[in-house]
Amino acid sequence: MTYLFKQIGREWRFMLRQRYVLILLLCSFLVSGFAVFTGLAEVAQQQQTIERLKLADVRDRLEAQAKYNDPGSLAYYSFHLTYSEPSSLAFAALGERDVYPWKHRVRMLALEGQIYESDSQNAELAQAGKIDFVFVISALAPLFIILLFHDLIASERSSGRHDLLVSTAKSKYALWGSRGLVRFGAVVLCLMLPFYIGAMISSTGFQAVLLVSLWCVVYLAFWTVLSVWLGKNLASAPRIASMLIACWVLLAFVLPILSDLLINNSVHSAKGGDILLTQRETVNDAWDLPVSTTMEAFVTNHPQYSDYTHQGEGFDWGWYYAFQQVGDQAAGEFSNDYRAAAANKYKLAGYATLLSPPLLLQRKLNRLANTDALAAFEYEQDIRDFHKALRMAYYPWLFAQEKFDKTHLTSLPQFKDSTHNYKKVQNEQ
């Protein structure tokens, strides 16, 4: 053991005299630091946006409540902010937050149109365009590992020192193990140190930091073992580097793109635009239909309001909100198919990650950070649950002629972000 420590100390001093190694380590530190810095800035911007919108949301709703006195007008002119806050780990894994919406302002109109006004593609397998910490570790770090380890043994062979080093060393495993351990420890430190600083700034929990560290070290060890194994069995450093880079390109870029294309071509569903069009056509057509036609469709799902009677010959808020809901009912089948297809794509993407370690790491860390497609699905369900609770609060005033008083507005449901729940994410791991 003492000999091993001496070897490690010697290899550390030897590494510090190798300029190209130091340059690679510095580059890895700078790239990781840049990714963490931009991640922290993005999360801070999202949090500031949410806080600003919260204040505006309360102000706008109070203005509407001061201006209108009947429940129909209040429901129409009152917007409600919904949002999905970034977790404390989101700075390291921004995930799908640039693909799926994380904020919506909804009101008691047909919900499908409000959700799908901007359609989003399922990009679970699309290669990330942003540079966050997960992208650096999964896609760029293997290149640093390859450059550091491809010639660990081959360079000594080409210089003629290999046989001398092996013959004079007490153990070839201690010789190459200490050299590899020093380089591996150095590159892991350079890549992970910015993450630890970012975790302290964002107050990330210890368990989350530990799990991220574990996944990253295992992933980097995979590339290190692959590089050393090829270097041990091949004599030419350029040939070793070429093979490793080919593996890197295949696993980090080619397989994800092919998997994405295959999944998108094999799973079909209605588009968000189709859902939006169906809902809006139903709502627009309702203006020309008899009130009884709309109410029959409405009470199919809301039988408790079957005694509702249209107030007068003109416009009536109850009828208006009834055909808004009927519009959602008409688009419901398309919406369910769309969401089922998105969930199926995510499931198939999980199988594809078994062929691509970079994708597997991204998927695991995005799940830990609660920034993946599942988090987006949960946020959308929160919106639907909140909208339903809001409707159930207003419907007795609109359809059952219950007495309305503005003091009742204080008991209206409030949106709560349930996606930002680290313990829940851990239970799903």
Model-predicted segments: where are they?
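Long, hydrophobic alpha-helical segments
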Residues: 129-155, 159
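Helix-loop-helix units of permease transmembrane domains in multi-pass membrane transporters
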Residues: 147-186
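Alpha-helical transmembrane segments of multipass membrane proteins
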Residues: 31, 35, 186, 190, ...
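Membrane-interfacial helix-loop-helix connectors in multipass membrane proteins
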Residues: 196-215
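Hydrophobic/aromatic residues in alpha-helical transmembrane segments
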Residues: 145-149, 222-226, 242
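Hydrophobic alpha-helical transmembrane segments of polytopic membrane proteins
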Residues: 212-234
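Selective transmembrane-helix segments that form parts of the transport pathway or gating/packing helices
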Residues: 20, 132, 140-141, 171-201
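Transmembrane alpha-helical segments and their membrane-interface loop/helix boundaries
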Residues: 1-126, 249-429
